[in-house]
C-alpha cells in the first residue's frame, strides 16, 4: 500500500522529506496497525497536503478498519478534489458494496473503467461480487471464468471456485440451458453444498442428497480440526450444518424417502 517514494514531496513551503514517515508507514501496514497508520498518513498530509500517496494510503487504512462511511465522506470532500487524478474507484465502489448499495457500487465501477474487459483483477473480482448480489448471474459467471483463466493457482482460487459454484447453482435454478457446473475437485464443503444446490435446481435428488451428506461431514470435520475449544466456532458450525440439513430434508422429501423429519431432528 505504501512505498518509500515519499522522499521530497512538495509541501506549502517547498520540498519536504517524508522518507522516514513512509518507512514507518510500511512497518505499521505489515503489522496491520491501520489505526496508527491512518494517523501517520494525516501527519504526512499536514506537511505535504498534496501527497496523493498518503491520501490513498489513508483511504485504504479506513477501509481496512471498516470505516466505509468515512471513506465516502473523504472522497466527497471538496477539499480533496486535488486527488481526483488518483484512481480510487475500487475503494469507493467497495464501500458502497459493503454498505449494501450494490447498484451504486456498480455505477462507480462503470463510470471509472469504461470497459469491464480492461479492468484490473481487483476491480473484476469486486464487479463479480456486485453482480452476484444484484442477481445478474450470467454476467457474474462470465467474469469469474475470465478471472480464473488468468489466475489459476493463486491463494484465492478455491474461494473463486466456491463463488462460481454458487453462481452455477443459481443459473440452474433460473433455467439457464447453457449453464453447467464447473469441473473441479470438491475439496471444500462449500463447493459440495453449492453443487448440491445445482443438483436440487436440476431435480437430481439422489446426487443432491449425496453431496449434502458429504458436505455436512466435511463441515463437521473442518470445524473439529480448526476450533476444538472455540464455542463460537461450534455455534457457527451448528448454523452451517443446520442449513445443509434443511436442504437435505427437502431433497429427501422430493425423493419421497420418508426420512426427511429424522434428518432435521438428528
Predicted features, each with a name:
Residues 40-42, 68-80, 102-113, 139-147, ...:
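Alpha-helical repeat scaffolds
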Residues 23, 57, 91, 122-133, ...:
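"A position-specific structural signal for the A-helix of alpha-solenoid helical repeats
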Amino acid at each position: 500500500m505504501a512505498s518509500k517514494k515519499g522522499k521530497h514531496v512538495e509541501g506549502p513551503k517547498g520540498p519536504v522529506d517524508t522518507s522516514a514517515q513512509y518507512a514507518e508507514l510500511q512497518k505499521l501496514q505489515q503489522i496491520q496497525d491501520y489505526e496508527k497508520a491512518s494517523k501517520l498518513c494525516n501527519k504526512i498530509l499536514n506537511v505535504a497536503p498534496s501527497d496523493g500517496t498518503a491520501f490513498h494510503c489513508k483511504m485504504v487504512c479506513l477501509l481496512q478498519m471498516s470505516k466505509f462511511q468515512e471513506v465516502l465522506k473523504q472522497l466527497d470532500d471538496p477539499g480533496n478534489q486535488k486527488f481526483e487524478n488518483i484512481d480510487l474507484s475500487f475503494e469507493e465502489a467497495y464501500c458502497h458494496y459493503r454498505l449494501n448499495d450494490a447498484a451504486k457500487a456498480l455505477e462507480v465501477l462503470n463510470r471509472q473503467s469504461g470497459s469491464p474487459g480492461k479492468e484490473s483483477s481487483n476491480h473484476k473480482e469486486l464487479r463479480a461480487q456486485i453482480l452476484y448480489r444484484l442477481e445478474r448471474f450470467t454476467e457474474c459467471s462470465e467474469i469469474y471464468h475470465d478471472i480464473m483463466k488468468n489466475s489459476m493457482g493463486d491463494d484465492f482460487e478455491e474461494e473463486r471456485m466456491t463463488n462460481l459454484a454458487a453462481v452455477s447453482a443459481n443459473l440452474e435454478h433460473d433455467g439457464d440451458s447453457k449453464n453447467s457446473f464447473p469441473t473441479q475437485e470438491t475439496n471444500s464443503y462449500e463447493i459440495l453444498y453449492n453443487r448440491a444446490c445445482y443438483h436440487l435446481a436440476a431435480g437430481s435428488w439422489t446426487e443432491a442428497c449425496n453431496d449434502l451428506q458429504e458436505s455436512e461431514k466435511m463441515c463437521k470435520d473442518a470445524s473439529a480440526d480448526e476450533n476444538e475449544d472455540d464455542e463460537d466456532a461450534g455455534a457457527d458450525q451448528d448454523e452451517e450444518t443446520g442449513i445443509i440439513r434443511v436442504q437435505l430434508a427437502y431433497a429427501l422429501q422430493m425423493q419421497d424417502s420418508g426420512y426427511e423429519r429424522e434428518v432435521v431432528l438428528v
